[in-house]
Regions:
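Histidine-centered active-site/metal-ligand motif
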Residues: 149
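Loop-rich catalytic cores of soluble enzymes, especially ATP-dependent carboxylate-amine ligases
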Residues: 119-137, 144, 152-183
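Terminal catalytic/cofactor-binding subdomain
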Residues: 1-135, 142-146, 181
């Protein structure tokens, strides 16, 4: 089937595009009053970085990651993110701030970037070891670059319609895995 015909066929299933889910992951560095990366551990008021699904750490103790659950509208995502941002700012220690830029603040060197610690459980040790490996391979400074990640997932109805149109003989998760990147 030609591309134009495939696109035309998909318009019949456009209602499935309103059933998708989205979320955001937002990273920010905590900095001390002097503008350098915080040497303080992840604030206890944020909950455990290992088990709190919405407030965790990314690479280092100072790189806070806010994670929204998946929602079906951008308004809900932004409302949830705003509420979480309000919470972390309210509970941030008085001697710290959030660095507003994606490029890191003043970093005195690799030794001044405390790798995230997730505790003594097997899962926690694995997460910390993974970050130590990133530090060894790429350097810790590179890992302190903060960003915003937009997550988007298509509904099962969309995938079924798309699969029937594109490759009827390929099914299930295998099809989804093979075709996500093309969209």
């Amino acid at each position: 089937m030609e591309l134009e015909a495939k696109i035309q066929s998909l318009t019949a299933t456009k209602h499935t595009l309103f059933q998708n889910l989205m979320g955001i992951e937002k990273e920010s560095l905590r900095v001390s009053d002097d503008g350098s990366i915080s040497q303080e551990p992840h604030p206890k008021t944020y909950g455990s970085a290992l088990t709190n699904p919405q407030i965790t750490t990314d690479f280092c103790e100072a790189l806070v990651e806010l994670v929204t659950p998946p929602f079906d509208s951008a308004d809900k995502v932004l409302e949830d993110l705003g509420n979480t941002e309000h919470f972390v700012h309210y509970h941030l220690p008085d001697n710290q701030r959030y660095w507003p830029a994606s490029m890191p603040c003043v970093v005195r060197g690799e030794a001044y970037i405390p790798i995230a610690q997730y505790g003594s459980s097997n899962r926690g040790k694995m997460k910390t070891a993974y970050r130590q490996g990133l530090s060894n391979r790429y350097g810790s400074v590179m890992q302190t670059i903060a960003g915003i990640h937009f997550n988007y997932s298509f509904s099962e109805d969309f995938w079924q319609a798309y699969q029937e149109l594109m490759v009827p003989e390929e099914t299930g998760q295998c099809f989804i895995d093979n075709h996500y990147i093309y969209l």
